[in-house]
Amino acid sequence: IMIYDAHCHLDLMDNMLEFINEIQNSDMNLFAVGTTPKAYSREIQFCKNARNIHVGLGMHPQLVSSGYDDMQLFKSLIEKSHYIGEVGLDFSKGYIQTKELQINIFSEIVKLCEQYSEKVISIHSLKSTSTVIEILRTYKRQKSNKYIFHWFTGSMPQLEKAIELGCYFSINPGMLKTKSGMEVIKAIPIDHVLLETDAPFA
């Protein structure tokens, strides 16, 4: 049986190198999402011998004005990057002030993914689900791209819209602890469900 973790933060683990060694000798596959383009370049080197670790080219919405939001570097790497994430929007209290910049960057990332195709994209959508869906509806054309909502926290009508767009959903233990999380899980078609740990957070 192959186990697949669709969203974890390998680069944020205290024992990253030890964990990489364990994973590459196991039957487990994982999508190691990144937070910045610079982190991606470093993590690719650490995981170059681990065929079952798929490193994501990320631009986390919480970091878009931190000095690490190097879109030029992102653009130079995306063509050869099959896995994209963590990307998306975060309109929670601590990050709402960068809302317009987040929208511009995420829109650009989706357009780039549509240009190159064959991408697997892990999306952060905290308190911003409707805008994420609007952007996907505007630019999503390639059937070969797989858009995954990580830890979906939107409403049921928003979930239905995301399903209509062909999106996937990675669920984690944190979602099992809330009534709304359980309702979301029950409503997702089984062939659109993926599992994630969100390690080291969930």
Residue ranges and their predicted role:
Residues 1-202:
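Mid-domain alpha/beta scaffold segments of enzyme catalytic cores
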